[in-house]
A protein has these predicted regions:
Chain A
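C-terminal peripheral helix-coil segments that are non-catalytic and often amphipathic
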Residues: 1, 91-92, 131-143, 159-160, ...
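Short hydrophobic/aromatic patch on the recognition helix
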Residues: 39-50
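Basic, helix-initiating cap at the start of DNA-binding domains
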Residues: 1-25, 30-41, 55
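Amphipathic alpha-helical packing segments from all-alpha helical-bundle domains
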Residues: 66-69, 73, 99, 116-143, ...
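Hydrophobic alpha-helical connector segments
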Residues: 59, 63, 70-99, 154-158
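Amphipathic alpha-helical segments used for helix-helix packing
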Residues: 96-117, 170-171
Length: 195, 195
DNA sequence: ATGACTTTAGAACGATCGTTCTGTAAATAA
DNA sequence: TTATTTACAGAACGATCGTTCTAAAGTCAT
């Protein structure tokens, strides 16, 4: 069944621009009008493809995170040591920033006006990256590279730091930011205590 | 010269509630109406004390950060080693969270509609805490406790992590969050590599 | 008590918000 | 070709936004 309409493409463009705007300006700070202008389609047409603003964001976040997880699963086997995986992850997070959407998800979830089912879905968002981080740390324990007493806490802090660094993607020079991503892994690995 | 008017008090109440709301819901997500309801004063009255929403936020951020800096300067001498200072700082940041306002400041500064002078002022916000962190690390180097090749980067990452942890103040249980603050210092100090 | 000034509430404004409705040109099916 | 469905634009809606205006009540000096 061939389609000559190219509605899917339009939907993709709207989704892409919306994700960008949400990442930069937050949920409340991004209007449908903004999305309309950035995508080049009318405001009314955004509603042809997406039920409302909240559902649009949830779709973006869920789909983005799913794609993120799949992409990481694809490249992860290329790195053999836990140490390498950790450095690779830091670069991966920087170049495939779904994490701003995580923060925006927190913003939405914190708003009392947000529907409970949406909040529920948003809380599940962080599971994908956290699981990926946790897997690396566990792998490092198994290979004897790492010594970690509190896996969950370590995972959480690592994710928190990487996520926070992503906030600077739109404002900081790429090379400098990349250095900071590397350095956070360095710090996690070795600390600063004199030995 | 005694004053029987107590306008200063209402101004303080409005400022306090506004800071709380901005921290929780962000700049765009907080309306003057919200602030009016939370403080118990009319919407118009908010404008009697503050010129507009933007100026209100800038005042809150600047004043809050100034108070934060003074308070830390007051307690800092109680801790003798750099290590102790670092742990003390993590607790201090958690209990005197001005850092959510830092994030909201980023949100405001990222918005093209924000006036340039406001953006300028907001960029200066992070200087106070960063200087405080940097002082601790430098102190640790001087006492021989720490070995740090990139002071600025280390400072930035430490501030980033603490700031990000503050985001969970309204959603996470206090004791658990406190554990994470402690643990981030642990990690910065020692890392996870097996020795 | 009177008049000046400060502090407050509340109505009102235009702009913009998220959303819905209406109309229409293009694509497909008959 | 005609009828139906799909893909869009754009006007319009009520609600809420940040902000301003009006006016009354409270406080103070005289």
């Amino acid at each position: 069944m061939k389609r000559h309409y190219d509605s899917e493409e339009t939907r993709r463009i709207i989704a892409e621009k919306a994700a960008q705007l949400f990442s930069q300006k937050g949920f409340a700070g991004t209007s449908i009008s903004d999305i309309s202008k950035a995508s080049g389609f009318s405001k009314g047409h955004v509603y042809y493809h997406f039920e409302n603003k909240e559902k649009l964001f949830v779709y973006l976040a869920l789909d983005g995170m799913r794609a993120w997880g799949e992409k990481w699963a694809g490249v992860s086997p290329n790195y053999k040591t836990a140490r390498d995986k950790l450095y690779a992850m830091s670069t991966f997070v920087m170049n495939n920033y779904q994490t701003p959407l995580l923060k925006v998800g927190q913003e939405l979830a914190a708003n009392p006006a947000t529907s409970p089912e949406t909040v529920q879905q948003l809380y599940g968002l962080a599971v994908t990256p956290m699981q990926a981080y946790s897997d690396i740390f566990q792998y490092g324990i198994d290979t004897g590279e790492f010594e970690i007493d509190d896996l969950q806490g370590t995972t959480f802090l690592f994710g928190t730091l990487l996520g926070a660094l992503c906030q600077h993607i739109y404002t900081m020079e790429h090379g400098q930011l990349h250095g900071l991503f590397r350095k956070s892994v360095d710090l996690f690995l070795s600390g600063i205590l004199k030995r």
